[in-house]
Design a protein with these regions (language model features):
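Short acidic-glycine-tyrosine-enriched beta hairpin
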Residues: 70-71, 81, 110-132
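Extracellular/periplasmic catalytic domains that process cell-envelope and extracellular macromolecules
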Residues: 68-71, 91, 99, 118-119, ...
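Ligand-binding loop in jelly-roll beta-barrel domains
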Residues: 121, 130-158
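Glycine- and acidic-residue-biased ligand/ion/polar-headgroup-sensing regions
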Residues: 92-113, 122-124
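Short, surface-exposed binding/anchoring microloops in extracellular/periplasmic proteins
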Residues: 58-61, 68-93, 97
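Short beta-strand His + acidic residue motifs that chelate non-heme Fe in jelly-roll/DSBH
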Residues: 89, 107-108, 116, 128, ...
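A short, N-terminal "cap"/entry segment at the start of jelly-roll beta-barrel domains
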Residues: 4-8, 19-73, 116-118, 163-171
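Conserved hydrophobic/aromatic beta-strand scaffold that supports enzyme active sites
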Residues: 76-78, 97, 117, 125-127, ...
Length: 171
């Protein structure tokens, strides 16, 4: 290989590496929220350990466990969705209990097959485990929807972390 060929290969490799760095380091935008969120209450919650065992009205066993091993930031959040609005893809570092107050909400989550979603009507509730769970809430209905979320977040952590749509959603 002559000197000119080696120089061309070196320049080509350098350009390829530079273009690769520019392409791979360009910012990727998360899907923005179009719903309106309002924090109704924020409070510091001491470490808690609650374990309750009881029975349902039909005599079936029932149990609940809530444990935090550090101070938490507790939130009560109201989310309002016009038809077609969503939270955008995001996660939370701690669990959330979501109550659907009016309308209906579809929860698309990364652990669902192709993120197909589960729809919840007014009067129902569901749990978001937090951590690595990436999800998006969507009002796919024709009327406004409202949710109330009760969240436990490790103290000092952001309440919401914007994410990209998971790659398994459209396989």
């Amino acid at each position: 290989m002559n000197k000119l060929s080696r120089r061309c290969i070196a320049v080509g490799a350098a350009l390829t590496a530079t273009i690769g760095v520019v392409v791979s380091s360009s910012p990727v935008q998360a899907t923005p929220s179009t719903a309106t969120s309002k924090v109704l209450v924020q409070a510091s919650v001491r470490p808690t350990r609650v374990f309750t065992v009881n029975k349902t009205v039909t005599g079936q066993p029932w149990a609940a466990l809530l444990a935090t091993y550090g101070v938490s930031d507790g939130y009560v959040v109201e989310n309002d969705f016009q038809p077609g609005q969503s939270t955008g893809w995001h996660s939370h570092p701690g669990p959330s209990l979501i109550f659907v107050v009016t309308g209906s909400i579809t929860n698309h989550a990364s652990d669902q097959w192709r993120c197909k979603g589960v729809t919840y009507a007014a009067g129902s509730a569901f749990l978001d485990a937090g951590g690595t769970d990436v999800h998006e809430l969507v009002n796919a209905g024709t009327t406004p929807a409202e949710t109330i979320a009760v969240q436990f977040i490790p103290q000092g952590q952001p309440r919401r972390i914007d994410k990209l749509e998971p790659s398994n959603c459209h396989v």
